């Protein structure tokens, strides 16, 4: 039997989308492991041992990340996703905001070796998972650019400058988070009228 989830929102805080939409996409569903780094974003632990993320914290962090990323030249934002379910959402995020996407295997030296054929010089890195995208994160740290990361309950965040707490493994969760973040970046730039995409446009196809 699946445990039904109810999450309350403090006071009159208004989320970017209804809480039910976050829950339907499974954004709140964490793992059965937690790190001390992610404790502050955990809402509760279910009877089956699964940690549940606080979607209000997720919502606030999407707002913060949108404001942060909107300060950068679009072409200087690099979004990376080794994880399959994050590849289409990451690519669509890049298309929507004018960023650059690097999906699939991240080739070492992409950010650190000017003599490498695929060398690029971003000013900020956005990753689907700081563990799965660890090579990109390491190189970002080496060259001194900030890292924004979608982080699940089991992630370490020591090399992450801005955490977005979310289920970073589920197809629907990654679709919704990248869609929301793209919309928020354009909103912060005053360009929301350019955002013509639906959530399904961001979803991985089979």
UniProtKB/Swiss-Prot annotation:
Belongs to the universal ribosomal protein uS2 family. Keywords: Ribonucleoprotein, Ribosomal protein. It comes from Methanothrix thermoacetophila (strain DSM 6194 / JCM 14653 / NBRC 101360 / PT). This is Small ribosomal subunit protein uS2. It comes from the Archaea. NCBIfam families: uS2_euk_arch. SUPFAM superfamilies: Ribosomal protein S2 (SSF52313). GO terms for biological process: translation. GO terms for molecular function: structural constituent of ribosome. GO terms for cellular component: small ribosomal subunit. It holds the Pfam family Ribosomal_S2. The gene is rps2.
């Amino acid at each position: 039997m699946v445990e039904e989830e109810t999450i309350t929102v403090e006071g009159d805080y208004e989320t970017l989308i209804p809480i039910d939409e976050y829950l339907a996409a499974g954004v709140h569903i964490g793992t059965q492991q937690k790190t001390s780094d992610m404790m502050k974003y955990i809402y509760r632990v279910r009877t089956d041992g699964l940690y549940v993320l606080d979607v209000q914290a997720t919502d606030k962090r999407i707002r913060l990340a949108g404001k942060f990323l909107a300060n950068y030249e679009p072409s200087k934002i690099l979004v990376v996703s080794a994880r399959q379910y994050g590849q289409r959402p990451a690519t669509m995020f890049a298309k929507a905001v004018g960023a650059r996407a690097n999906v699939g295997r991240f080739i070492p030296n992409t950010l650190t070796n000017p003599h490498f054929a695929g060398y690029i010089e971003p000013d900020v890195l956005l990753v689907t998972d700081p563990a799965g995208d660890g090579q990109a994160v390491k190189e970002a740290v080496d060259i001194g650019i900030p890292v924004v990361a979608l982080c699940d309950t089991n992630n370490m965040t020591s090399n992450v400058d801005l955490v977005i707490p979310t289920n970073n493994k589920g197809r629907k969760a990654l679709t919704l988070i990248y869609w929301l973040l793209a919309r928020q970046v354009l909103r912060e730039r005053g360009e929301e009228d350019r955002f013509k995409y639906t959530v399904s446009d961001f979803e991985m196809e089979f």
